[in-house]
Design a protein with these regions (language model features):
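Contiguous, often N-terminal, cationic amphipathic patches that form binding interfaces
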Residues: 1-84
């Protein structure tokens, strides 16, 4: 199985999304799709994502915005990843 999640995004916008909308921002493999990203987040963080939005940045990286369920706090996952 290929590595789907490459690294978390550590920008101010990513932290603001964690605090306000319970969304974590990740850089993922360019070839991965939304269902693979959901499975990777579910297995890595033991939480079920509600929604995944993706985009390809001008630097040719794929960025995924993963909205977590309300029973999971994105700030806890951010602290675990070292974003906060």
């Amino acid at each position: 199985m290929k590595e789907v999640i490459i690294r978390p995004v550590t920008s101010e916008k990513a932290v603001r999304l964690m605090e306000s909308q319970n969304i974590i921002t990740l850089i993922v493999d360019l070839r991965s799709n939304k269902s693979e990203i959901k499975k990777a987040v579910n297995s890595l963080f033991k939480t079920k994502p509600v929604k995944v939005n993706t985009l390809i940045t001008p630097r040719s990286e794929k960025k995924a915005y993963v909205k977590l369920s309300m029973d999971t706090n994105a700030l806890d996952i951010g602290a675990e990843l070292g974003v906060i």
